[in-house]
Amino acid sequence: MRIQSLLLLGALLAVGSQLPAVFGRKKGEKSGGCPPDDGPCLLSVPDQCVEDSQCPLTRKCCYRACFRQCVPRVSVKLGSCPEDQLRCLSPMNHLCHKDSDCSGKKRCCHSACGRDCRDPARG
């Protein structure tokens, strides 16, 4: 009986760890991600939206140029970008702008010196 209880507990933990991936979006949040925000803050503008449900069908409420606005969503691959512990001494150089610029399962991630394609972090 004890072994069955441990197996059941293990199965529940395994299934529970996958729930955020399936049910991780908030109500009203659209699939996809926000495009990168490289623009400097030029002036203070009020937010055009607070959440995705305030945007037309194919747009998401994203932070861009220092305020939230409805922008076309971009596809996002599974996994998260690894942390970068380095500091850049040269000007930033972007080798990608969005996940779809990268081959296979690689993600377009911020690095010390710009964005580049990297394998997702294991976690």
From Swiss-Prot:
Identify the domain of life. Answer: Eukaryota
Tell me if GTP-binding is a UniProt keyword of this record: no
Per the database entry, which stretches of residues form a coiled coil?
A: none
> SUPFAM superfamilies, from UniProt?
Elafin-like
**Disulphide bond pairs:** C34-C62, C41-C66, C49-C61, C55-C70, C81-C109, C88-C113, C96-C108, C102-C117
Going by the UniProt record, its keywords in alphabetical order are: Disulfide bond, Protease inhibitor, Repeat, Secreted, Serine protease inhibitor, Signal
Which Pfam family is one of those matched by this entry? WAP
Q: Point out the signal peptide segment.
A: 1-24
User: Might you report a single GO cellular component term?
Assistant: extracellular space
The residue ranges crossing the membrane are: none
A biological-process GO annotation: antibacterial humoral response
Q: Name one GO molecular function term.
A: serine-type endopeptidase inhibitor activity
Task: List where in the cell it is found.
Answer: Secreted
InterPro entries (UniProt xref): Elafin-like_sf (IPR036645), WAP_dom (IPR008197), WAP_four-disulfide_core (IPR050514)
User: Where does the WAP domain start and stop, copy by copy?
Assistant: 27-73, 74-121
| Principal subcellular localisation of the protein | secreted
Question: Could you tell me which PROSITE patterns the record lists for this protein?
Answer: WAP
Q: Write down the PANTHER family for this protein, in alphabetical order.
A: WAP FOUR-DISULFIDE CORE DOMAIN PROTEIN 5, WHEY ACDIC PROTEIN WAP
Q: What does this protein do?
A: Putative acid-stable proteinase inhibitor.
What protein is this chain from?
WAP four-disulfide core domain protein 5
What is the organism field in this record?
Answer: Pongo abelii (Sumatran orangutan)
